[in-house]
């Protein structure tokens, strides 16, 4: 699958992308999950990790495209993609 693109807007961030197979065919109906990365500090080992917190999900269209709108520009996010059809 292909890397995700992003665009920046004044009021927030619009994240949109296209999911494709290695042969460039679009992945139709793939589940796309948006997570906000929340820092978790482990006192015992004095290490900070990030845990994903679910925000929303969607499905890719016939061209393999998806889109999310985010208002919190100061946070980090993770996008997970799952192929429903297992081509």
Q: Where do the protein language model's features map onto the residues?
A:
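Beta-strand-rich domain onsets/edges
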Residues: 1-28
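Surface-exposed coil/turn segments at beta-strand junctions on protein surfaces, enriched
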Residues: 8-10, 59-61, 72-74
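Exposed beta-strand and adjacent loop surfaces of beta-rich binding modules
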Residues: 14, 29-31, 76-78
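Short, ordered, surface-exposed loop/turn motifs in non-cytosolic proteins
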Residues: 22-49
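Short, acidic Ser/Thr/Gly-rich low-complexity loop/linker segments typical of extracellular
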Residues: 40-65
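Short Pro-Gly-centered beta-turn/loop motif in secreted/extracellular proteins
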Residues: 67-78
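Conserved structural position at the C-terminal beta-strand
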Residues: 81-83
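Short acidic/polar inter-strand loop motif in beta-rich domains
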Residues: 85-87
